[in-house]
Regions:
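Short coil/loop residues immediately preceding or within conserved phosphate-binding loops
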Residues: 31, 94-96, 124-126
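Hydrophobic residues in beta-strands and at strand termini
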Residues: 48-50, 101, 148
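Non-catalytic linker/capping segments at the edges of enzyme domains
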Residues: 1-55, 168-172
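Residues located in well-ordered beta-strands
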Residues: 35, 98-100, 112-116, 128-130, ...
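Short histidine-centered catalytic/ligand-binding loop motif
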Residues: 52-64
Length: 172
């Protein structure tokens, strides 16, 4: 069984949107409501607990929801790199993604999502990530190629951070 050591949380991304994964619950009641974090080792991370409306089979998360969570946390690894290395914001989007479902993610249980950049080749960012439990056991594994969006590189869009609170995890 593959496990992972927890990492210290060092920053929190700010969210204001209505998305299915990171949307604010008050703006999208069916959102997973994930906060995204910068981890000390340069990974991105999140903590989540799914609700019954996120299920596929009885009390099991729909694979599309877990894929969306992994896509989001892997995408945020680009912004984690920008934070850690003090780089300019670069918009990215998913080019390809593959998910391996090792065991069911259950509704009502707490899980963690983590993502990291494995390598960069030109506009391509090769990224991997996992959904794990509190013991570090892997439930879903993802690999993706993200592409930079050169037409948006000079936009005013940027990633913002917000202060950490006592309710934020200390490690993921």
């Amino acid at each position: 069984m593959t496990t992972r050591n927890k990492q210290k949380v060092i920053a929190k991304f700010r969210h204001t949107g209505q998305g299915i994964v990171t949307g604010l619950i008050e703006r999208n009641p069916v959102s997973v409501g994930c906060n995204m974090y910068v981890l000390e080792n340069g990974e991105s991370g999140t903590v989540f607990k799914l609700k019954p409306w996120h299920q596929g089979h009885e009390m099991m998360a729909h694979g599309g929801i877990t894929a969306s969570i992994l896509d989001e946390v892997m995408g945020y690894s680009n912004h984690t790199r920008e934070y850690v290395e003090d780089l300019k914001y670069t918009p990215v989007f998913t080019g390809t993604a593959t998910y391996i479902y090792r065991r069911p993610v259950m509704v009502g249980e707490t899980y963690y999502g983590v993502g990291r950049i494995d390598r960069i080749e030109g506009r391509k960012r090769f990224i991997s990530g996992e959904i794990i439990d509190s013991e570090g056991n892997v439930y879903v594994k993802g690999e993706s190629i993200f592409l930079t969006a050169p037409s948006l590189e000079d936009s005013d869009e940027h990633v913002a951070y917000q202060p950490m609170t006592d309710s934020d995890p200390k490690e993921i």
